[in-house]
Regions:
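Extracytoplasmic metal-acquisition and chelation regions
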Residues: 4-9, 20-116
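Hydrophobic core
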Residues: 12-18
């Protein structure tokens, strides 16, 4: 009888030890930053200043590219599909945004026009 109690106690203690050593959150759960895609570099810079380290921010049109003549690549469309927020300047500045959003399949995407 004492052996059974001792064995049960050891198993119980081992279980508690293992449970105490496990992490309740995975690395993905710990990184809860929102993913923001911006259309061009000035919008990226402003967004970066506002969001700080609370968001992962990427830019579609680089600093040395022309936003008027930009054509979104498949990689850019995929990036917007995976984003939480897409921020662009205006329809007049980036006429390609309308066609981009037409092919994006992310129903949870928040789209922000930063005009003005």
């Amino acid at each position: 009888m004492k052996k059974k109690i001792r064995l049960a106690s050891v198993l119980f203690m081992a279980t508690l030890f293992l449970l105490a050593c496990t992490s309740p959150e995975t690395a993905e759960e710990q990184n809860e930053n929102i993913h923001i895609v911006t259309s061009m570099f000035p919008v990226y810079e402003i967004t970066k200043e506002i969001a700080g380290d609370q968001a992962d921010i990427s830019v579609m049109v680089g600093a040395n590219e022309d936003a008027h003549h930009y054509e979104p690549s498949a990689k850019a469309v995929a990036s917007v599909n995976e984003a939480d927020v897409f921020i662009y300047s205006s329809d007049e500045m980036e006429f390609w945004v309308e066609s981009l959003l037409a092919v994006v399949e992310n129903d949870d995407l928040t789209v922000v026009e930063s005009q003005g």
